[in-house]
Amino acid sequence: MCRDVYVYGTDEAATPDSNPPVIESIYLNHSSFKEWQTVNPSPMLIASVTDDRAINLSTAGVGHQMTIYLDDGGKSYTDVSDFFTPFDDGRPGGTIAYPLDGISQGPHSLRLRVWDTAPNSAEATVYFNVADNVAPVIYDVYTDRNPVSESANFYISHDRPDQTITVTVEVFDLMGKPLWSSTETGRSDMFTTMPLTWDLTDSGGRRVNRGIYLYRATIKDESSGDETATASRKLAVTAQ
């Protein structure tokens, strides 16, 4: 059995592309990151990149793949495109969320280089410090609803994306009496913990009365020492 195979070249009538990609943002762990901020030894580099046509995600072309350089070439990471997620709205571009590991203490730089399919390239550099025992940061603590009548799911917004963290939530009455607590350890879902659910009962299994309660959330990054972060909020419980 025979088949015809057609091989096509480039379109000579196509408009040349001389516009490089745009790195719209680059930071470590959270968008609140500031230059030379101190981070944990296993931070995540996050960048938003766009192009007027298309970002090159191929790893076949030597020197034209997405690359991250640590300390201006002291070490390079060439599997960056595996951690690229396209924009949901169909724009030519997306988000890079690249997990790093084992960076030594002290000052460092990370330089990101991306290409489009022309190929044109763009670069951006982020400067930072690394230290052990860096406490995580809690940006928000909240429940899926407030007030609640049947159960409450607690969430914590933080700066430890894709890290193994221990989360504890404690509930108190307004006199400070502890009523309930729960602790879980697991992989964080980027910037938000998985929910811890309270069924509105105390440690003895009795449903709490309607009223206002205090809850305190604590997180600990298991890869970054014993430092913790804590935040508290109020929760209203109504009748069923």
Each model region followed by its residue ranges:
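Short, compositionally biased P/S/T/A/G/V-rich stretches that sit at domain boundaries
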Residues: 8-43, 50, 131-147
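Long, low-complexity serine/threonine/glycine- and acidic-rich segments characteristic of extracellular
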Residues: 27-32, 46-132, 178, 186-191
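Short, conserved beta-strand segments of beta-strand-rich sandwich/propeller modules, principally
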Residues: 44, 107-111, 153, 166, ...
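Surface-exposed loop/turn motifs at beta-strand-loop junctions within extracellular Ig-like
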Residues: 51, 114-118, 173, 202, ...
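Short, surface-exposed loop/turn motifs with a glycine/proline- and acidic-biased composition
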Residues: 100, 104-105, 185-224
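C-terminal tail/sorting-segment detector
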Residues: 124-127, 131-142, 151, 206, ...
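Glycine-centered coil/turn sites that cap beta-strands in beta-rich domains
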Residues: 134-173, 195, 223-225
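Short, glycine-anchored, charge-dense loop/turn motifs used at functional sites
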Residues: 171-179, 213-215
